[in-house]
Curated annotation (Swiss-Prot):
Protein name: Glycerol-3-phosphate acyltransferase
EC code: 2.3.1.275
MF term (GO), any: acyl-phosphate glycerol-3-phosphate acyltransferase activity
Example GO biological process: phospholipid biosynthetic process
Subcellular compartments: Cell membrane
Gene that encodes it: plsY
Pathway(s) it belongs to: Lipid metabolism; phospholipid metabolism
Species annotation: Bacillus subtilis (strain 168)
Enzyme class, broadest EC rank: transferase
The reaction(s) this protein catalyses: an acyl phosphate + sn-glycerol 3-phosphate = a 1-acyl-sn-glycero-3-phosphate + phosphate
Length: 193
């Protein structure tokens, strides 16, 4: 019973639409009607600006971190990464936003922040290196996911390897429109690097 409650709670935490809430509070807009139409942090940065976008990314990361901590907070015998996966599913398919959410990047990062802080720190550094080199947030996100799989292979944590592999595949799948735009040379590049 407690495991089911924890899974539902993790999903509901992930379902909190940070981008929608911050968009309404900061600018009075629904970010799903602007930019890429996505509820994630990248669209929040593009449509709301750096300050509000930073709040969105922090909120999305926090969702993954909090959900991954639930097994410890609730004293439930379930692997924390499983709770984190349900938060990611909530973020991508949020019940509070008609099941149309983000692309799983920041919330997946939040899962790793709690479970594997060193991986999270190196992942953020790797993301910014890829962003500097490519100027594409989407491509940097996908390449960083691949980095997490390689890293996880060497730390000999089977659960971590399985979860980051599945999350990376999911992140790449969620970016399929971005991949087409990169190939067609229509994907927006970051201008501040």
């Amino acid at each position: 019973m407690l495991i089911a409650l924890l899974i539902i709670l993790a999903y509901l935490i992930g379902s909190i639409p940070s981008g929608l809430i911050v968009g309404k509070l900061a600018k009075g807009i629904d970010i799903r009607e602007h930019g890429s139409g996505n509820l994630g942090a990248t669209n929040a940065f593009r449509t709301l600006g750096v300050k509000a976008g930073s709040v969105v990314i922090a909120g999305d990361i926090l969702k993954g971190t909090l959900a991954t901590a639930l097994p410890f907070l609730m004293h439930v015998d379930i692997h924390p990464l499983l709770a984190g996966v349900f938060a990611v599913l909530g973020h991508v398919f949020p019940i509070f936003a008609k099941f149309k959410g983000g692309k799983a990047v920041a919330t997946s990062g939040g899962v790793l922040l709690f479970y594997a802080p060193l991986l999270f720190i190196t992942m953020v550094a790797v993301f910014f290196i890829f962003l500097y080199l490519t100027k594409f947030v989407s491509l940097s996100s996908m390449l960083t996911g691949i980095y997490t799989v390689i890293y996880s292979f060497f730390v000999h944590d089977t659960y971590l390897l399985i979860v980051v592999t599945l999350l990376t595949i999911f992140v790449i799948y969620r970016h399929r429109a971005n991949i087409k735009r990169i190939i067609n040379k229509t994907e927006p590049k970051v201008k501040w690097l």
